[in-house]
Amino acid sequence: MKKFAYSIFFMVFLLTAWLWTSDAEASQSKDGITTYKETHVLEVDENGHAKEIQSKSDIIDQARQQFKNRPHDPPQRNMPHGDTVVLQPSTKNKNTNKTPDANTKVANTIVIDTLFKLDQSKKAITHSSTIRSIIGKAKPVIVIVGSTLFVGDDYAGKYNAISTYTKEFTGSQIKVGATKSKTYKMVKTKFVYKSDILTAGWVGSAPGTKQSTTETYLVNKNAYQYPQIHNSHSGKSLPAPTKANMKWYKPEDRVKRDKDIRNKYIRWYIGKYGDPKWDWSGLDIHHVIPLEYGGDNKMGNLYALTRTLHQQEVSPWWRGYR
């Protein structure tokens, strides 16, 4: 039987003026922990970007002002379709930098990792910033890291800052392993995204500031991310609800499950996408919006899942929805 595949996507963010790149890497969930990591590389070349040599105090003041004035830009979001939306992160690969040529010598580099960790055992989200490495003739005179978690009940609606930190490293504090983190305890299902602002400055060059934003994720009250599942045959991904606070209906108030829903869906699927030659006995027909939350038996609200995915990934997520 052909299998449905998970899709893990990678994000790349780059900034002009500074030779700064960022790579985001998502790890598979392990022991109830899912981690998203972005690696940010900030380099200043020997040719410099400021003609006037500035003092250490000037650089620190400029860096603080840049960091303060940088806004938290929201992420781009997919277009909802009715009551559902595909949350699957899209691949991003954007490079607006000028590639250094043979005459450009990189003198100073700092690498900072930012982390977004979902821990089901603690029912919490941790976000952190860590200096991974410092390379070059001189280290920065100031590094400022800041991170904010934003949450909302409506995918396309308003988001509020719920957990934030700012940390300034100077002098001997600027070292490999220097870290700042904060943990937020989940109590309700929410749409969540993280925004990081990073600033670094070396004497002799204007400070550089970078803002990076994750995708928007749907996370239940147990810090369990909504499963990202893709059907390679139909080309369709499992949609998510657009609301994190849907009303729960008593059994007597719900739409009744169609007893012939399985056969109807199989006929509909083959008619729309062609015969995948699956062993349908190993598949479950899942209601994207469950009946207990106002879902119905329409074909657009159904999605075929392997029994393992349905019972071990999707159903457990919904048990922690409210």
Map each language-model feature to its residues.
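Bacterial N-terminal signal peptides that target proteins for export
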Residues: M1-F9
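Nuclease and nuclease-like effector domains acting on nucleic acids or nucleotide cofactors
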Residues: D31-D284, E292-R322
